[in-house]
Structures are given as structure tokens and as C-alpha cells.
Amino acid sequence: MTIKHITVQQAHQEQGTGAKYLDVRSIPEFEQGHPEGAYNVPLMHVDPETRQMRPNPEFLDVVRANFPTDAQLVIGCQMGGRSAKAAEILATAGYRDVANVLGGYGGAPQFGHVGWVQAGLPVAQTAADDRGYTALRGKAGDR
């Protein structure tokens, strides 16, 4: 399975044709702002004691509970690193139409990638009730 690597502009265009934007940043990052229409399933969580990032052991289960393997998914994070890892995990798990968003939400200027915000694309501060991690995780518990 080949993972596509796309710009934020391409990700926005793909959203317009039915792709789901999966934001794999932490819950606090997502709550500070995210691409409009995004779903939040963190690849990593902030450990409350150490303040360090640690893997989310439920990542794949939550994605599977909410998106079929034939879903068109564009995966974004802050700069593109976590989303590349998440895209790899999903492709290995059988997801067939996965794209990593280069530059993510905040941009990666050191690699020449503009972020969602810098590109002037639509941003939201709050998620629809069914797109935040708590709601998505709840669906995984129903399985």
C-alpha cells in the first residue's frame, strides 16, 4: 500500500469530495484549533504527570470503530510527522485510501511545507459533537 503525501490545499480539496480529515494531534492541540470538519483521534496523548507524549494504545481501535477500511482519509497533525506514522499504521491495518498531509496544521517551513493556518484554509475552535475524541472513542466502546 502506497501512502500519498499531499499539501494542505490538496487535503482541503479532497475534503470537498468526501474525504475525512483525521487530525491525530493531542486533544489539547485539537481544542486550540483544527481544520474545519476534522475528526480527532490522537496518535499520542500528553501524560498528565510527566507532560511527555505517550502513544495512544486505542488509536487503531477508535479509527476502526468510526471509519471503514475503504474510507478516504487525509491524516494531519501539527507538522506532518505524527500523521506520517498514523498513515503508516492505518495502511498496514488495511486502509486503502490514506494520505499524509505535509505541513499539517502549523506548517513545517524547514521542509518547505505550508500549514493549514498559513494557507488561510477554514479553521474551527470547536468540533461537532460527533467529531471530538470522546465521542469517537465512545463508538469504539460500543463495538
What function would you assign to each model-found segment?
Residues 1-20, 27-72, 81-143:
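Rhodanese-like catalytic fold shared by cysteine-dependent sulfurtransferases
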Residues 75-76:
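Short, surface-exposed ligand- or partner-binding patches at beta-edge/loop junctions that are enriched
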